[in-house]
Design a protein with these regions (language model features):
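Short acidic/polar inter-strand loop motif in beta-rich domains
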Residues: 111-119
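Short, aromatic- and glycine-rich surface loops/edge beta-strands on solvent-exposed regions
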Residues: 102-112
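Short metal-coordination and nucleic-acid-contact micro-motifs, chiefly zinc-binding Cys/His arrays
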Residues: 2-8, 19-22, 106
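Transition segment at domain starts
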Residues: 16-52
Length: 120
């Protein structure tokens, strides 16, 4: 399993990923599942059927409004990473076709409630 870490620039809001133990100076590290918010609306729900991976954000559907939405879903596999960007008014879900890859974890980023992760 990798040691991907996520960071956010407090001034511009950009999200960066890093690998390894060296922190990214000037950026705030995001720790998954630590924001006081509704887990049932934020934890990724993952369904794997063969090489098709379906991710729905929350067991209760997350809102997708311009002021509160899921910006992206990222799937970590034994071979790398796959990201799907979302927009307000879209369903908070993503489908990935990953032949020959095993899903390790799924992350999502909410513009208000931060980073969330489900490990498989």
């Amino acid at each position: 399993m990798s040691n991907i870490r996520f960071y956010r620039c407090e001034s511009c809001g950009i999200i960066a990923y890093a690998f390894g133990e060296q922190p990214l100076p000037g950026l705030k590290e995001l720790v998954p599942n630590t924001v006081d918010a509704s887990g049932e609306k934020h934890l990724p729900v993952v369904n794997v059927e063969g090489d098709k991976v379906t991710v729905r954000v929350g067991s209760v559907e997350h809102p997708m409004l311009p002021e509160h939405w899921i910006q992206w879903v990222l799937v970590e596999t034994d071979k790398g990473f796959h990201r799907h960007n979302l927009n307000p008014a879209e369903a908070p879900e993503a489908v990935f076709t990953l032949p020959g890859e095993k899903v390790i974890a799924v992350y999502e980023y909410c513009n208000l409630h931060g980073l969330w992760k489900t490990s498989l």
